From Swiss-Prot:
Functions as an intracellular arginine sensor within the amino acid-sensing branch of the TORC1 signaling pathway. As a homodimer or a heterodimer with CASTOR2, binds and inhibits the GATOR subcomplex GATOR2 and thereby mTORC1. Binding of arginine to CASTOR1 allosterically disrupts the interaction of CASTOR1-containing dimers with GATOR2 which can in turn activate mTORC1 and the TORC1 signaling pathway. Changing residue 90 to A: No effect on interaction with the GATOR2 complex. L-arginine binds at residues 111-112, 274, 280-281, 300-304. This is Cytosolic arginine sensor for mTORC1 subunit 1. Changing residue 302 to K: No effect on interaction with the GATOR2 complex. One of its GO terms (molecular function) is molecular sensor activity. It comes from Homo sapiens.
Amino acid sequence: MELHILEHRVRVLSVARPGLWLYTHPLIKLLFLPRRSRCKFFSLTETPEDYTLMVDEEGFKELPPSEFLQVAEATWLVLNVSSHSGAAVQAAGVTKIARSVIAPLAEHHVSVLMLSTYQTDFILVREQDLSVVIHTLAQEFDIYREVGGEPVPVTRDDSSNGFPRTQHGPSPTVHPIQSPQNRFCVLTLDPETLPAIATTLIDVLFYSHSTPKEAASSSPEPSSITFFAFSLIEGYISIVMDAETQKKFPSDLLLTSSSGELWRMVRIGGQPLGFDECGIVAQIAGPLAAADISAYYISTFNFDHALVPEDGIGSVIEVLQRRQEGLAS
């Protein structure tokens, strides 16, 4: 398998809900006029707490500093795994890279963020951790770094500085999980038809906020949750929304897999997770991979979210609770 280090240098930000008005114009520009900003990596995820943005340096320039904007300190690099076989299962998601990428990085104390899209899975690592990433994964993967759009082979010698890293550390924190009742769909869209849904998209993202109060509460099982993720990365669009929100969009423009599968969410974290802890993704992806359960995984500024097939949510909760009990004992 090949591991590609993409050219994007990504910043991770949080826009507080009360300050959304200040960012409506630049966000609309990034959403609908990417050529104007030259942004090639744009992801916006709405949660009950805030709006998380993952944007490259060109996109970051569009966002003015303010009291409503929090910026994670690190610059993140984007990794992508490609398999030589063209028969990859469309919705395997984070499960297919849990053992080969996520677990080894957790063992070497590399903090990762995940962004699963309709098309692929992006793994974000801090720029300063790249040497450890390469050293850790070089045996498993042919590693290439994109330079000027062309893949250049990376050897382990290129990454010898700062390695090895201490391999012992505290046991992973056991984070609580919740499973809201929403049913989600993972969709794509031909970029040429994006203008046709622009009005609806703007309404859903910026003006539709009649969320049940329990969605943002600390109750163990919120009945529903505000969650909408849109990404436009290298010309490909991916949208995650709940089935009720999907009804607002013209059905003939949104494309999904032939099965039209619906997904349920597992939300990870009781308190904001931060960016320094390692192994959070592995805590979820590992057990799902062992049980051969497909999952999309989306990290946000405060919490993590896994999407699993609707008909398997009961067994997923059981698997993860068993894992939690094992870690806690």
